[in-house]
Swiss-Prot record:
A cellular component term, taken from the record's GO annotations: plasma membrane
Name assigned to this protein: Uncharacterized lipoprotein SA0096
The organism of origin for this protein: Staphylococcus aureus (strain N315)
Lipid-conjugated positions (S-diacylglycerol cysteine): C24
Coiled-coil positions: none
Predominant location category: membrane
Keywords of this entry: Cell membrane, Lipoprotein, Membrane, Palmitate, Signal
Lipid group attachment sites (N-palmitoyl cysteine): C24
Record's bilayer topology term: Lipid-anchor
UniProt cross-references to InterPro entries, sorted A to Z: Csa, Csa_sf
Keyword Cell membrane: yes
Length: 255
C-alpha cells in the first residue's frame, strides 16, 4: 500500500511538473508574439513614407526632442548546393525629425580564402527615397542593378501578420541572461507570406520554410537589441536559402 501511495504521489508530481513546464512555455510564446506584434501589426506598410508619422518603442536612450529613425531592412540569401552564397538586400534609415531617407542596396557574395575561411565580397549602392520612390544617388552602369533598386520592395510593404495568433506549438527559446528569445514555426507553401516571397524571388526549392521570430533585449520593449524575422527554406552545410526582415526605431544620430 505504501509503495502504491508513493507511486501515486510520484505520478502526480510528474504531471504537475510537466503541466508547469508546458504552461511556462506557452506563456513565454505568448510574450514573444506580443513583443513582435507591436511592429508586425503595422504590416503591410504600402507607402513607406507613412513611417514618418508612425510611433515606435521609446525609452531613456532617446532625447526628448528626438522622434527617432526607423531602420528597415530586407535581404534574400541563396546558396545552391556546392556553390557560393549570394545575397541581395536593402536597408533604409528613415529620419522622422527631418522626414528624409537614405540607405543602400547591397549585393554580397561569400568567397573563401586559401585556408578555406569565408570572406564576404560586398558591393554597396547608395540610395535615397523621394515621394516613396527609391532612387540611386550615384550613377550605376549596370542596368540590371538599376532596375532591381527601382523595383525593390521591402517585406514590410507586402507581408502580413494579421493572423500571427494562428501560429501555434512553436519551438520556443528564451535566455534571460542575455536576454534573447525566439519562436520557430513550420509553415506551409499555402501560407500568404510564403506565396508572396515565391512571387518575388527565385527560390530554388519547393520545401516549405520555417518562420523564425528572434530578438534580444527586454521582451517588453527596448531600443537596445534587435527583432528579426526569418523565413528559412534550407539550412545545411554548403546549402542555404533564407529571407530576413527587420523594422525597428532607434535614436537619431542628428540628436
Amino acid at each position: 500500500m505504501k509503495r502504491l501511495n508513493k507511486l501515486v504521489l510520484y505520478i502526480s508530481f510528474l504531471i504537475l511538473v510537466i503541466s508547469f513546464t508546458a504552461g511556462c512555455g506557452m506563456g513565454k510564446e505568448a510574450e514573444i508574439k506580443k513583443s513582435f506584434e507591436k511592429t508586425l501589426s503595422m504590416y503591410p506598410i504600402k507607402n513607406l513614407e507613412d513611417l514618418y508619422d508612425k510611433e515606435g518603442y521609446r525609452d531613456d536612450q532617446f532625447d526628448k526632442n528626438d522622434k527617432g529613425t526607423w531602420i528597415i531592412n530586407s535581404e534574400m540569401v541563396v546558396q545552391p548546393k556546392g556553390e557560393r552564397m549570394k545575397s541581395k538586400g536593402m536597408v533604409l534609415y528613415m529620419n522622422r525629425n527631418t522626414k528624409t531617407t537614405t540607405g543602400k542596396y547591397i549585393v554580397s557574395e561569400t568567397l573563401h580564402d586559401e585556408d578555406g575561411r569565408p570572406k564576404s565580397k560586398d558591393k554597396e549602392y547608395p540610395v535615397k527615397m523621394v515621394d516613396n520612390k527609391i532612387i540611386p544617388t550615384k550613377g550605376i552602369k549596370d542596368e540590371n542593378i538599376k532596375k532591381e533598386i527601382e523595383n525593390f520592395k521591402f517585406f514590410a510593404q507586402y507581408g502580413s501578420f494579421k493572423d500571427l495568433s494562428k501560429y501555434k506549438d512553436g519551438d520556443i527559446s528564451y535566455n534571460p541572461e542575455v536576454p534573447s528569445y525566439s519562436a520557430k514555426y513550420q509553415l506551409t507553401n499555402d501560407d500568404y507570406n510564403v506565396k508572396q516571397l515565391r512571387k518575388r524571388y527565385k527560390i530554388p526549392t519547393n520545401k516549405a520554410p520555417k518562420l523564425l521570430l528572434k530578438g534580444s533585449g527586454d521582451l517588453k520593449g527596448s531600443s537596445v537589441g534587435y527583432k528579426d524575422i526569418e523565413f528559412t527554406f534550407v539550412e545545411k552545410k554548403g546549402e542555404n536559402t533564407f529571407f530576413t526582415d527587420s523594422l525597428h526605431l532607434e535614436p537619431s544620430e542628428d540628436k
